[in-house]
Amino acid sequence: MSWQAYVDEHLMCEIEGHHLTSAAIVGHDGAVWAQSTAFPQSKTEEMTNIMKDFDEPGFLAPTGLFLGPTKYMVIQGEPGAVIRGKKGSGGITVKKTGQAMVVGIYDEPMTPGQCNMVVERLGDYLLEQGL
């Protein structure tokens, strides 16, 4: 399965009538492997800062998580495994795998829990596959 198919079929799938706003799979080096059409244009530095937070949990807390034009307040995640952010009625979940980061962005009516489930389910699958 192509990386784009993982984004289209597993991240942008319908959950209880709702979808993520956008999603992507990004390499640890910050290079985007696949993304949905609405995924924000991001800088490599933004992705490498996210990666740094996995290596140094709490790195993003003072400044927030920036992705494209949006700044997310970093909230409780799983150190070294999952980063979660909040912005108004929406937010972001990032799951680290062996080779990539799975990123999901949501807004109401999708809930944080639904976003976490979609992103972490694919991330766990990729980890099981050695990816």
UniProtKB/Swiss-Prot annotation:
GO terms of biological process kind: nuclear migration; regulation of actin cytoskeleton organization
Family: Belongs to the profilin family.
Localization annotation: Cytoplasm, Cytoskeleton
Record organism: Zea mays
Stored InterPro entries: PFN (IPR048278), PFN_euk (IPR005455), PFN_sf (IPR036140), Profilin_CS (IPR027310)
SMART domains: PROF
Functional summary from the UniProt entry: Binds to actin and affects the structure of the cytoskeleton. At high concentrations, profilin prevents the polymerization of actin, whereas it enhances it at low concentrations.
Any further remark recorded for this protein: The variability of the residues taking part of IgE-binding epitopes might be responsible of the difference in cross-reactivity among olive pollen cultivars, and between distantly related pollen species, leading to a variable range of allergy reactions among atopic patients.
Maturation and modification: Phosphorylated by MAP kinases.
Protein name as it appears in the record: Profilin-11
Molecular function terms from GO: actin monomer binding; proline-rich region binding
Disulfide bonding pattern of the chain: 13-115
Short motif Involved in PIP2 interaction, span: 81-97
Oligomer status and interactors: Occurs in many kinds of cells as a complex with monomeric actin in a 1:1 ratio.
Gene3D superfamilies: Dynein light chain 2a, cytoplasmic (3.30.450.30)
Chief localization: cytoplasm
Keyword terms, alphabetized: Actin-binding, Allergen, Cytoplasm, Cytoskeleton, Disulfide bond, Phosphoprotein
GO cellular component: cell cortex; cytoskeleton
Post-translational modification Phosphothreonine, affected residues: 111
